[in-house]
A protein has these predicted regions:
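Residue-level detector of conserved catalytic or cofactor/ligand-binding positions
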Residues: 226-232
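Ferredoxin-type iron-sulfur electron-transfer modules and their immediate structural context
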Residues: 1-214, 221
Length: 233
């Protein structure tokens, strides 16, 4: 008798406390790639799907890994217009490979960029550059990143712009940018003055301003000793 009463109580409780299922959100989530990268600006695929279903956003083109194909699929489910998806890629803004910069210490700890950064900024002379231990390689779900001569390099054709590497890099030198702008990126994030930069890296930006002066379109500016290019110009 006690078992029967308990069973009935659980049955009633399951009905009363049941959470309504958002079928549209589930359908949208099924159309998403499932990377849960957060590049869309929401907590993950489920968060983006819920926002679309509940009308919190009408932008169907926020999923960078899914691209135009996913945008069209979402538009079909929701009845919204398919959003424009600009092809994006992550870029490692550093040229401090083994030929351009020296090591200042013999690091023998865990091969982790995050761990190495905590020891005098890392083993390389330039404290702003890529350490090259591959934390970004480990988190990339698309095998788009490889270490080449001590620096991480990203294959733009394999990159899905999920931002996993951007969020992982302890140096903050990986930027996400439109694919067509990547070739015009200034590949250095050294904040030191020119004389110091020369000592640290042969390929580092020394802030000589030549690119600023010679660019007839005004597409290059200097912010905090870092040259910034504007490819759209």
């Amino acid at each position: 008798v006690i078992g029967l009463i308990a069973g009935l109580g659980l049955a009633v409780a399951s009905k009363v406390m049941a959470v309504p299922v958002d079928e549209k959100a589930e359908e949208i989530q099924a159309a998403l790639p499932g990377a849960n990268c957060g590049a869309c600006g929401f907590s993950g695929c489920s968060g983006y799907a819920a926002a679309l279903s509940q009308g919190k956003t009408t932008d169907t083109g926020r999923c960078m890994p899914g691209g135009a194909e996913v945008s069209k699929a979402i538009a079909k489910i929701t009845g919204l217009a398919a959003g424009d998806v600009v092809p994006m890629t992550a870029v490692v803004l550093c040229q401090g490979n083994m030929h351009n910069t020296d090591t200042k210490l013999n690091y023998v700890g865990v091969k982790s960029c995050k761990m190495a950064t905590q020891l005098f900024g890392g083993p390389k002379e330039c404290v702003y550059g890529c350490i090259g231990f591959g934390d970004c390689v480990e988190v990339c779900p698309y095998d788009a990143i490889h270490i080449c001569e001590g620096v991480a390099r990203i294959n733009p054709l394999a990159c899905h712009a999920c931002k996993m590497c951007v969020n992982t890099c302890p140096k903050g030198i990986i930027d996400l940018m439109p694919l067509h702008e990547a070739k015009a990126a200034v590949m250095c994030k050294n904040h030191d003055k020119g004389a110091q930069t020369r000592k640290e890296c042969k390929a580092g930006c020394i802030g000589c301003m030549k690119c600023v002066k010679t660019c007839e379109y005004g597409a290059v500016t200097v912010l905090s000793l870092i040259h910034i290019s504007e490819p759209t110009r």
